[in-house]
Design a protein with these regions (language model features):
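N-terminal pre-catalytic segment of deacetylase/amide-hydrolase enzymes
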Residues: 1-31, 36-50, 66-69, 187-191
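Metal-dependent polysaccharide deacetylase catalytic core of the NodB/CE4 family, i.e.
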Residues: 27-28, 38, 49-176
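Charged catalytic carboxylate motif
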Residues: 43, 102, 184
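Short, intrinsically disordered, charge-balanced linker/junction segments flanking boundaries
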Residues: 105, 191-193
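Histidine/acidic-residue-rich catalytic or RNA/ligand-binding cores of hydrolases
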Residues: 150, 180-183
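H/E-rich (His + Asp/Glu) clusters that bind or coordinate divalent metals
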Residues: 157, 184, 192
Length: 193
């Protein structure tokens, strides 16, 4: 079973986080998780330039450390960035102290007030501590572009089916999502415009 939209009960557990933005006009927020990755992030940046679209990249600190010039290029092209932990760790597997330490280590490189937990997983204590320093941005549409059980057309169909005004959509600029992303992202941008 795939869940492209977070269940209501989960959104109610973390009401202070941002799941979508209220919006009457046609405004959609594209976000990318897990980069920067040299094999895919430049392609994403070029595509966004081609369509004159800005996005927010939730970056993994260790990827930023390995690809500092690529991270700088994201910012140079006018996109926003957010923190996605240093090592893409799941909050539910770590103590509050260790999780916050990992997030803060990433922020030494990323320098952003935005945070998104990998897989959307965090504990109440972690969320409470994170809110002291960061704005927690979740999503209301996850494309599942990384899934081997979906093809690019199904990923695109997820975007069409679940997106509404104010939606925060998650794609992944990662190697495991590359094939589906290369198919679905251009079609999604065309459809969203």
């Amino acid at each position: 079973m795939f869940i492209e939209r977070p269940p209501l009960f989960y959104r109610m557990l973390f009401p202070e986080t941002i799941w979508r933005l209220p919006c009457k006009e046609k405004t959609i927020y594209l976000t990318f998780d897990d980069g920067p990755v040299p094999e895919i992030t430049p392609w994403v940046l070029n595509l966004l330039d081609y369509y004159n679209v800005k996005a927010t990249f939730f970056c993994v600190g260790e990827n930023v450390a390995r690809n500092t010039e690529l991270y700088a290029e994201i910012l140079k092209r006018g996109h926003h960035t957010g923190n996605h932990t240093m090592n893409h760790i799941q909050g539910t597997k770590y103590s509050v102290k260790d999780y916050i330490r990992n997030v803060d280590a990433a922020n030494e490189l990323i320098h952003s007030a935005l945070f998104r937990p990998p897989h959307g997983h965090m504990c109440f204590g972690q969320a409470h501590e994170l809110r002291q320093k960061y704005k927690i941005i979740m999503w209301d549409v996850v494309t599942r572009d990384y899934s081997k059980k979906l093809n690019g057309e199904r990923v695109f169909n997820n975007v069409k089916k679940y997106t509404r005004n104010g939606s925060i959509i998650v794609f992944h600029d990662s190697l495991k999502g590359e094939k589906n992303l290369r198919h679905a992202l251009p079609k999604s941008i065309e459809w969203l415009k």
